[in-house]
């Protein structure tokens, strides 16, 4: 049976070595930062993730301190 995961939206606050990022979740009551790593699909597609980007992150129900970044949301003010 596949593990159930929560999907949240968040903001990248800090870039760490080895493709890790600190992410502040939007729809969670506590303002904790969680550790996010880049999924393989994003890595293969050469999608750049920078501090200030909005992302979708998949968080395990068992360990809510880390998650996998699965999607980078488009910026509303960019022209591309």
UniProtKB/Swiss-Prot annotation:
Keywords: Chloroplast, Initiation factor, Plastid, Protein biosynthesis, RNA-binding, rRNA-binding. GO terms for cellular component: chloroplast; cytosol. GO terms for molecular function: ribosome binding; rRNA binding; translation initiation factor activity. It is found in: Plastid, Chloroplast. Signal peptide: none annotated. Disulfide bonds: none annotated. PROSITE patterns: S1_IF1_TYPE. Residues 1-74 form the S1-like domain. Component of the 30S ribosomal translation pre-initiation complex which assembles on the 30S ribosome in the order IF-2 and IF-3, IF-1 and N-formylmethionyl-tRNA(fMet); mRNA recruitment can occur at any time during PIC assembly. One of the essential components for the initiation of protein synthesis. Stabilizes the binding of IF-2 and IF-3 on the 30S subunit to which N-formylmethionyl-tRNA(fMet) subsequently binds. Helps modulate mRNA selection, yielding the 30S pre-initiation complex (PIC). Upon addition of the 50S ribosomal subunit IF-1, IF-2 and IF-3 are released leaving the mature 70S translation initiation complex. Belongs to the IF-1 family. This is Translation initiation factor IF-1, chloroplastic. It comes from Illicium oligandrum (Star anise). The lineage of its organism: Eukaryota, Viridiplantae, Streptophyta, Embryophyta, Tracheophyta.
């Amino acid at each position: 049976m596949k593990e159930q995961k929560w999907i949240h939206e968040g903001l990248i606050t800090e870039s760490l070595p080895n493709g890790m990022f600190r992410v502040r979740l939007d729809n969670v009551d506590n303002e904790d930062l969680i550790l996010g790593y880049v999924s393989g699909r994003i890595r293969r597609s050469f999608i750049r993730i920078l501090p200030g980007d909005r992302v979708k992150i998949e968080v395990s129900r068992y360990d809510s301190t880390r998650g996998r970044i699965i999607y980078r949301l488009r910026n509303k003010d960019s022209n591309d």
